Amino acid sequence: MNKVYKVIWNASIGAWVATSEIAKSKTKTKSKTLNLSAAVLSGVICFAPNAFAGTNTEGGIGQGTSISGTTSCREGSANTANQKDIAIGCGAQTQDRTGSNIANRNNPYNNSTGAYAGAMKQGGAISVGTGAVVEKGLGTAIGSYATTQGISGVAIGTGALSSGNTALAVGRQSAATADFSQAIGNVAAATGKGSLAIGHSATAEGYRSIAIGSPDIENADPVAGQAGAAYQPKMATKATGKDSIAFGGGAVATEENALAIGAFSESKGKKSVAIGTGAKAQKDNAVVIGDQAEASFEGGVAIGKGARSEAENSIALGKDSKASQATGESFLTKQSAPTGVLSIGDIGTERRIQNVADGAADSDAATVRQLKAARTHYVSINDNGQPGGNFENDGATGRNAIAVGVNASAAGREAMAIGGNAQAIGSGAIAMGSSSQTVGRGDVAIGRNASTQGAEGVNSNQSVAIGDQTKAIGDQSVAIGADVIAKGNSSVAIGGDDVDKIARDTELSNTYTEITGGTLQAGKYPTTEANHGSTAVGVQAVGTGAFSSAFGMTSKATGDASSAFGVMSNASGKGAAAFGAVAQATGDGASAMGINSLASGTNSTAIGSGNKPGEGANATGNSSAAIGSGAQATGDNSAAIGKGAEATNENAAAVGGGAKATGKNAAAIGGGAIADQENAVAVGQGAQSLVEGGVALGARSKVEAKNSVALGQDAVATEATGTSFLTNRDASQSNGVISVGSAGKERRITNVEDGSADSDAVTVRQLKNVDSRVNQNTSNIGKNTQNITNLNQKLDDTKTNLGNQIADTNKNLNDAKKDLGNQITDTNTKLNTTKDQLTTQINDTNTELNNTIGNTKTELNTKIDNTKTELENKGLNFAGNSGADVHRKLGDKLNIVGGAAASTPAAKTSGENVITRTTQDGIQIELLKDSKFDSVTTGNTTLNTNGLTIKEGPSITKQGINAGSKQISNVADGINAKDAVNVDQLTKVKDNLNGRITDTNNQLNDAKKDLGNQIADTNKNLNDAKKDLGNQITDTNTKLNNTKDQLTTQINDTKTELNNTIGNTKTELNSKIDSTKTELENKGLNFAGNSGADVHRKLGEKLNIIGGAAASTPAAKTSGENVITRTTKDGIQIELLKDSKFDSVTTGNTTLNTNGLTIKEGPSITKDGINASGKQITNVADGVNAKDAVNKGQLDNLAAKQNATDDAAVKYDDAKTKDKVTLKGKDGTVLDNVKAGHISSTSKEAVNGSQIHNISNSIKNSIGGNTVVNPDGSLTTNNIGGTGKNNINDAISEVKNTATKAKTTVTEGDNIVVKETVNKDGSTNYEVSTKKDLTLNSVTTGDTVLNNNGLTIKDGPSITKDGVNAGGKKITDVANGVIAQNSKDAVNGAQVHHISNSIKNSIGGNTVVNPDGSLTTNNIGGTGKNNINDAIKSVDEKVTNGVNDLTQKGLNFGANDQKTTQGKAVHRKLGDTINIVGGADAKTAEDKTSGENIITRTTEDGVKIEMLKDVKFDSVNVGGHVLNQQGLIIKGGPSITVNGINAGGKQITNVADGINAKDAVNKGQLDKQINEVKDQIGKDIGKLSDHAVQYDKDKNGNVDKSSVTLGGGEKGTNLKNVADGKVAEGSKDAVNGGQLWNVQNQVDKNSNDIKNIQNNIDNISNGKAGLVQQQKPNGEITVGRDTGGTSINMAGKEGDRVVQGVKDGEIKAGSNQAVNGGQIHKISESIKNSIGGNTTIDPKDGSITTNNIGGTGKNNINDAIGTLNQSNQELGNKITNLGDQLQQVFYDTNKRIDDVEKKANAGIAAAMALENAPFVAGKYTYAVGAAYHGGENAVGVTLRKTSDNGRWSITGGVAAASQGEPSVRVGISGVIN
């Protein structure tokens, strides 16, 4: 009979109890409240096939609810141990462990053969079933022997085990052993935390793992007769990895994040995925999808049935696809095999990939459409059916190389070979054409058999060979044409070898012969050829001379630097130039211009054409000039100007058509003029000077007499004959005559001055005067005769008178004769004067004409090629750091020199320290910062391979350090045996032995003062000399300027006259020459350094050759004597003398100058001595002589006896200051028997361990709780106030945090706004709304998506971060964008059209703008060309035809060795590069070099490179000796660095007596000390122990520095005046009472703060001072050995002494040992840790500072606790309020429980109303029921359908109760066997 139970309220115990409605009224002795018992019972009823089929309630026992049978329970009645427990069923217990055996299903996770009911740990548990056990509170165990061991765990099913917290195990012998795990199914196991296992034998072992599925159940072992019930490990579903998932029968996921879905799928790699029946992902990150698909390598992907990925990172896509390991290089690109592949099939089952978009990136897949578009048309390679090399596209073996063609090979990096048998071997080389070959770097060979390969072992670089059979075999050579050879470095050959067609063309051949006189020969093929630096352009052109140029067919330039322009032109002389067809320039420096011109003389010039060979200008004489057709200048220095002009003798000049000057120094000027004798001059048309020295001036004038002059047209000067009139002088044949006319054509000489000398010409005026006097005399004679006749009679009378008259008359006649003679003489004199004047004028005219001729010659030679004149003069300007710019004409030599002698052999110089860099301004010369020299001299200081030597000063060499009788000052105390010692150390020895060293006077300042005066006088003299020299220079400059002005005036006048004379010629030549001027100016020269880009300078521009020193550096600061330059093949190499001299050398902090060696903040060695700068002088050999330095070993030996007795003494660290005592124990030293020191704020006395212990103990008592005093005096605090915290700060913070919790906050999330308001009832209202401005990841509206990347419209435009994509649409209505350099605006079509139109207008002509904006141009500028490039090229070709030999002339560069036989000038063409290099590696980094030591100055000869006398280097290496920032290191010898002086095991000799404390001492001083103290040793030393504090001795009598026992007896000894020791962890310093007082004072304060308890610590009684003596002021302290407590006063003069090396003393009650700062710090640290928070320790005195303890804002414990109390009070108020609120919650909860009770009763009634329908095979059956329970009622209807064979049935039902919602039930039942 079914029993009915109900739940009633037991008012006596205040609990609900379950009781039978029909049993006797028998209550349990005790019961426990179960608030939700109704729900639990209804759940239990639902599990039963028949509701409440059971027994009465008499069988249960215990304090809770126990329900079981009373008589048939073999296992015993149900039993509960707690009031809240429920045990239902026989043997169900919540206390004792009793049980029985169950059938074992071999679950390895739950294989117990016995189930026991265990004692309940806490209440609230449910166990239902025989042997069901719940071991933790709130657990549930339902089923026979079900066990729950974790809190809130659930175990449902026979033998189910739930051992993890909140774990769930459902199913027979299922196990959920980990926290939060779930196991559902027969023998299912969930052992991983948070794992889930569902299904037979399903196992989830990993953290958060999931296993769903069953194994091979049919083959599982039977259990108790049940087939397949045992745990089946085979094909079991398993998830063993962290976060792994196995879903499906036999699925396995063994690694972290592995996923296996499908029957027997396997995922055995980390983060691997296997989906599909039998799918296997064996390695990490593998992905497998498909039946039997498999990926066996890491990262593999297999998708599709049977797909296999058998290589790492490979993908197999599609049914039976296979992805294997990739091998071999990639086709075409030759990339190595990748690490993975993508396979969409297998061999024989390949697949096609369809609907592939065109690829864009290099690694994108390409489509057939792209291949069709990329297919190259009209390209094919025919191997005639015979595959050759490169058939497999493997001919390109170099990196990034290209090989196209049969047998083509490209072995060089980035090389290209195109054509059959083409070979590109060099890096970057190009070979195009059959059998073409390039072997050098950057070579280009284009054409059949074109090659850049020279003889064996000779290969070119960057050469170009273009044409059939063409070869370019020199570096940077160019060969273009058929059978052309450019065999020289930097050569250019353009042309060919075949003139057959021209030779066979009669007309052309005849033309060639007419012009050249030669014959073209068919069948002969001389090749176009160019040598080093040469250029040959034209068929059969030859440029074999170095730096030569040959332009034109069959032209030849065979001389070095020669130039030949024109067909068959020839320039065979060095520097020769031939311009024009058949022009011949065969002499060195010769110039021939014009057809058939010839210049064969050295430096000769021939300008003029002739129709036939020999008819052109001919200059065969050296320095001769022939200008004009047929002009002949055959004499040296001769000049023939004009058609057919001849100058055949030395210095002869013929100017004018047909003019002939055949005599030496003769001049013929004018058409047909002849001067055929030496010094003859003929000026004028047809003028002839046919005698030596004759001058014919005037048209057709003629001189036939030697030294005669014919002046005037048609004048004839013949030989003089006869005697002179009156004077009867014979004519002079040697002096010649002057003729101003000829017979019948005499000329009047007018405007003649009256003659005065006998040889002067007389004038008509003078003759008239003579004639007048003669007439007067004749008249007188006539009168006298008449008188005689008329007066005969008077004859006798008058005879005497007459005689007198006759005598007078005779006298008068004689006088008249004499006067007439004088007049004639005067006339002759005047005539002679006139002759001289005429001669002078003729000579002046001759000179003027000669000047005109010479100037015309010079001007024409210059103007023939204006570039050769103007540009030669323009040249280049060179500038240095200082000095005027230096100008060099083209061809001039620029000397780039240093100050060293040019004869200096190369072995004495080196360029390894020099490097040049090209800069924007020119060439910068720099020195390596780490330079190497054989020798460096700075004034009197020399640094070489032997070491450092200062003249008349100290030296440091391999042999040792010689102080040069100078002091070694500022020497640090020696430490090691070989260290130098200073006077201070020696003085200390002497003081210890009561001796004194007599001081000596230092006279260095006087010497320095005298030297300064001398330098000042020298400077004054130098300044005076400089001033005088400046005045002289000024005067010289003034004179030079005056001379310059005069010369300028003369030159200008001459130039004006010359321009007037040959202006027409100049005008004609200017237009031609100007066209090439600009080009040649721009060509200039290139300059290169060791590194940097080449620097280009136009002609006339300035090239700066500078150093890094300031340009303003005065010359006195620099010198070029260390610099030398040498010319090399590449240019100018700048070198430094290996033995260099400087005023100063600076390397970092180290300076070497004439005074010596100085290291900043380090030692120095100068003339004044050695200053060690507070550093040690180490490795000093033992001193021997009196002036040798002594080392510390010698000093130690001297003090050995004292040390023997003094070793046990405790000493001050510094005997003078007495502020510190360091005890020498290895692990510290224990000071025993230390009397308790006074503890106060001012105490300096040492304290002992017992005092520390007392303080620590007082702190312990103040803190209380678990505080412990450790043996070292520190404190340990644990769980202060039960807070779980170990320091006061954290404890207070913990209490504060607890008080401030229980706070509810509402915060705003993304796009959310929270508004807080207060309701009328005082409660808080939170209004939540969205923000007006939202922040979202993405917004999608239809086809439009707006996200972080931008705006995208499907199949339309997009605006994203990558830009605007119009999507194939037009962008219309675009406003005009800004067109500027930095504009990013879009532009529209109108703007583009406007631009195109403006370009059209700029080009002009026939330019047309097309509709699409493009431009069409035709016949630009009338050139016939249709594009600007070709048009400019066409114009440029016309300009370049005028380029001449000035390109070759360039500049010459000289160096120091140019002045010797060792070097020669370096020549560079215009546009070429001149390398100005040093010997350092060009790859030297810029931070390794510096130009700051170099300066360049321009001089008259060029640019002079100088170095600063005071130079700076990072390092100087001299023969292995290094001078750098650290100092000087001598290889194998001493060193002096910032760390001190290391003598290198050598003696320091010749050391002056040390004076100051830090001066070095010599052995003489040491010996003197020894002698002075020899008698004193032993007198007082033995008594030292009576006065000194000493270390203890060990059992062997040796000094034990780990212990010092003070001799104060039992009471100890006070250590007074102890300086504050360091209070820190690990400190071994002694601490004094003052420090402890500070600590104690702080502790007192903290103690008061903690519990407001005032602990007064009495002053510790201290004993009186014992026997402590200080022998004299600032002397040693000795502690007496008297018994009783004594103290050591360490106050000292300033009260700042410290006792160091104090070993840890004992800290305990009764301890009187001294403690050190480390112990005090440890105690303070423990106090700090106990207080916690922001507590800090002052390292000076160990005091403790606390801030904001526990976050209370208070700085002491008392206030913090007060704050805490207030918080606790506030917390109490909050708790009280919380209790009131909880009362209301309980009231509401009870009310809800009442409602639950009603609904539970209604639920029970509903369950009871669902009556089981009958079980009839093949039929539908039903049942209707009604029930009443606990005041609630229900009705129910059940429907059953049973199968025809009766083996299963399905049931469904519905019930409606008086409370709650309707209940629905569905179930299925069947028969297993």
UniProtKB/Swiss-Prot annotation:
Induction field: Expression is growth phase dependent. Expressed at high levels during early logarithmic phase, and expression declines throughout the logarithmic and stationary phases.
Signal peptide region: 1-53
Spans annotated as Translocator domain: 1773-1873
Gene3D superfamilies in the record: 1.20.5.170, 2.20.70.140, 2.60.40.4050, 6.10.250.2040, Apolipoprotein, GSPII I/J protein-like, Serralysin-like metalloprotease, C-terminal
Segments forming a coiled coil: 785-873, 982-1062, 1635-1662
Keyword Transmembrane attached: yes
Positions of region (Surface exposed passenger domain): 54-1772
Transmembrane regions: 1818-1828, 1832-1842, 1851-1857, 1861-1872
Deleted gene: phenotype: Deletion decreases biofilm formation and decreases the virulence in the murine model of lethal infection.
Entry keywords, A to Z: Cell adhesion, Cell outer membrane, Coiled coil, Membrane, Protein transport, Signal, Transmembrane, Transmembrane beta strand, Transport, Virulence
Role this protein plays: Important for biofilm formation, binding to various extracellular matrix/basal membrane (ECM/BM) proteins, adhesion to collagen type IV, and for survival in a mouse model of lethal infection.
Domain notes per entry: The signal peptide, cleaved at the inner membrane, guides the autotransporter protein to the periplasmic space. Then, insertion of the C-terminal translocator domain in the outer membrane forms a hydrophilic pore for the translocation of the passenger domain to the bacterial cell surface.
Membership in a protein family: Belongs to the autotransporter-2 (AT-2) (TC 1.B.40) family.
Listed name of the protein: Adhesin Ata autotransporter
Gene transcribed to yield this protein: ata
